[in-house]
Amino acid sequence: MIQTLVNFFRTKEVRNKIFFTLAMLVIFKIGTYIPAPGVNPAAFDNPQGSQGATELLNTFGGGALKRFSIFAMGIVPYITASIVMQLLQMDIVPKFSEWAKQGEVGRRKLNNVTRYLAISLAFIQSIGMAFQFNNYLKGALIINQSIMSYLLIALVLTAGTAFLIWLGDQITQFGVGNGISIIIFAGILSTLPASLIQFGQTAFVGQEDTSLAWLKVLGLLVSLILLTVGAIYVLEAVRKIPIQYAKKQTAQRLGSQATYLPLKVNSAGVIPVIFAMAFFLLPRTLTLFYPDKEWAQNIANAANPSSNVGMVVYIVLIILFTYFYAFVQVNPEKMADNLKKQGSYVPGIRPGEQTKKYITKVLYRLTFVGSIFLAVISILPILATKFMGLPQSIQIGGTSLLIVIGVAIETMKSLEAQVSQKEYKGFGGR
């Protein structure tokens, strides 16, 4: 592990990408401490608890929401917009489906629409959030209670989201890994210690016999270890489909090529968890504009993973998004065509259409196992808060840890691939 990190910094180009990414994250972190104009940050000094959606925004935004900073909306509107756009591409909007098949040009068009939708959502949600928080804090948040003040705050928060989207693009282009994922990763890491401290304080408050509190702490540590091991297993597990070659191959060529087709048990990674959590924010937005309406509150309660209905919906969403994104990441038809062109085949399966059907069947089975495993791992922290009386930050913290592990694994793989590529080029140049 240490040697791997050393290798990252030995390669100049990779080292520069790491430093660039860190510089962008420093800018992100500084922004989480700059309050939006016209607000009183001291209004949050005496928090009265928060809901799951609020905790999610705060966690993904690196604590920016509870400071009501310029990055208070974070990157969540972009995630929500991405979900909507992915769904609309499924022949719901023919033009989007057409763009999705146009390669790089089509992807650029879809990305632009996603950004416009994200900025629109950020503006709508920021207005509602300003009203909700000001009411929640009994008018102590907004200094000047005027329409112009609310509009100014909404514009600044929307600009903050737009800047974070741009920041993510810069990291993707010039830094390490996927920029949006890296920003979420950094935001979660910066709030995770506070969640653990809150848990420690809650566990020992009012406890004459501290043995029960220490038992809770031990239980949390064991749970975190099991969650980490389980997450790594489900994210890294691979099914190897054997491959044979129709043409004669020399021993040398066979030795240089993989004789199997690797399919991940969970090809979607942690994206389904991020999407499922962000999806809950859509119905909860109604409470921002209709805080006193009973029907809006009922919808919001159903969209809370802590409620019985919300927990079932959360599990179903994770499973559905896992299937959906697995087939976005893995294209059985393209795989079958590539195997046929290379003169290779799966033993006992005809090349072409039969191979496509076989890969699809295997992917369905693997994704079923992966989605159930992912749902179980995601639901455990929620059950812990529900039945052990733990603070809600642990619920978000458990899900966040899963996201952190997934992003860390993908980023490490990206770095290793870049180092290997540089070493290969260096070897070829000598």
UniProtKB/Swiss-Prot annotation:
GO biological process annotation, one example: SRP-dependent cotranslational protein targeting to membrane, translocation
Pfam family name, one: SecY
Organism per entry: Staphylococcus aureus (strain NCTC 8325 / PS 47)
Function text: The central subunit of the protein translocation channel SecYEG. Consists of two halves formed by TMs 1-5 and 6-10. These two domains form a lateral gate at the front which open onto the bilayer between TMs 2 and 7, and are clamped together by SecE at the back. The channel is closed by both a pore ring composed of hydrophobic SecY resides and a short helix (helix 2A) on the extracellular side of the membrane which forms a plug. The plug probably moves laterally to allow the channel to open. The ring and the pore may move independently.
Lipid bilayer topology: Multi-pass membrane protein
Transmembrane segments: 18-38, 68-88, 117-137, 147-167, 179-199, 217-237, 269-289, 308-328, 368-388, 389-409
One Gene Ontology term, aspect cellular component: cell envelope Sec protein transport complex
InterPro entries for this protein: SecY, SecY/SEC61-alpha, SecY_CS, SecY_dom_sf
Keyword Transmembrane belongs to the record: yes
Protein family membership: Belongs to the SecY/SEC61-alpha family.
Protein name according to UniProt: Protein translocase subunit SecY
Keywords from the named record: Cell membrane, Membrane, Protein transport, Translocation, Transmembrane, Transmembrane helix, Transport
Record flagged with keyword GTP-binding: no
Compartments where located: Cell membrane
